[in-house]
Amino acid sequence: EGNAAGLGLLPLVTQFEKNKTVQHCETQFATDLSGVWTALSDVQISGYEIHQGQTTQHPAMAKAGDVAVCALPNALGWQNNKGNVLGIYLHGLFEDEAALKALFGISTPILDSVFDGLADYIDHHFEPQFLNKLIKN
C-alpha cells in the first residue's frame, strides 16, 4: 500500500493496494484514440489485466488542463492529450492478433508460433546429445 513516483508521461496517480489483480480480460479500445494510437480505436483485444492499485486523473494536473483520456474501460488504459503516449494495464497487447493487424496493417505471427518454429528448427537441425552438452556446461 502507498505510492511511488512514476515516469511522469501521463497525468495520473495510482494508489497502490494490498491485493494484486491478475486475470484474463477481453475489452475494447475507446472509439476516439488519437495520434499514433488512432488505429487501435474501437479494436477488441484480449490479454492479462495485471496491476496492484487504482489509477485516476491527477487532481492538480487536471485542474491545470492536463487531462488523460480513458483508452480502455474500467481505467485499464489511458492516453495523454497529445496522443503520443498510451499506458495500459492489459499485458499482451503485442501478442493480440487484432491489435497487431490494426497497428501494422498485416497479420503478424504471435509469439507462441515464433517459439514453436524455433523449437522445430532446433529439433530438426541439432542432435539431442549436443543440446544436452550445452545445457550441462
Question: Model regions: which residues?
Answer:
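Short, glycine-/Ser/Thr-/acidic-enriched flexible segments
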Residues: 14-15, 32-34, 51-57, 85, ...
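Short, functionally important structural connectors and interaction interfaces within domains
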Residues: 2, 70, 85-86
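Conserved beta-strand scaffold positions in the cores of enzyme catalytic domains, especially
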Residues: 9, 45-49, 85-89
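Cysteine-nucleophile active-site neighborhood
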Residues: 1-46
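Catalytic beta-strand/loop cores that center a nucleophilic Ser/Cys/Thr
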Residues: 34-82
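Acyltransferase
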Residues: 75-137
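Generic hydrophobic alpha-helical scaffold/packing signal
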Residues: 11, 24-26, 47, 51, ...
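Short conserved micro-motifs at the rims of enzyme active sites and ligand-binding pockets
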Residues: 19-21, 59-61, 97-102
